[in-house]
Amino acid sequence: MTEATHVTKATHGIKATHVLKPGEPVTLPPAGNISFEIETGQRLRLAQPEGEQVADLISFNRDDVRELLSMHSSRAVNLNWKLTAPHLLYTNRTREMWKIEEDLTAENYCGGGYCSEHLNIARYGAPGTSAPNCQSNLEAAIRGYGMDRWNFNIDACFNVFMTVAYDENGVWEIRPPKGKPGDYITMLALLPQIVAISNCPILFNACNNFRLKPLTVEILA
């Protein structure tokens, strides 16, 4: 496994290289992003030191990046749209990719999608222009692997710790996340993968309860 990872502070445009070693958690700053590799059989832990912070996660088969995480496949195979432990997550080729082993918050959005400049403008008008967003964060994260925006899509994105509600009329609402300080999710890698995570920078809605907070990322020893 390549230990070098790529961490970017999206709010300042500063890029630095970190080393993600098993057993040594890395702090992902508010609005930041990270990319790294994980081997089959290793476990990824994503934690909320302060709670109420959403992460957008995408991942690729390291041996063929055309195969990537799929929320559609994951919902269809599990026959469930509230994916948490002990569910499996699947690729766009419907192969097992992750097993969720622990999930203290037990609240994730599996509909696919991420905030983007175009979406922010459509929803919030001019203030959305050039505002930090998960699409640009994820693109920045994977750039070091020779990939760009066109290597992933909204179906690939697992919105970890995100709370979304539907009412009886079909109204879709983003609500404040339920994560408490110290909550985490642990996922077992079932393929060798390239992983990218955006610490969601959205402040226009309740996704992060209107305050950006750090996350910690760790490959367990």
Regions of interest found by a model, annotated:
Residues 2-221:
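Acidic, Ser/Thr/Pro
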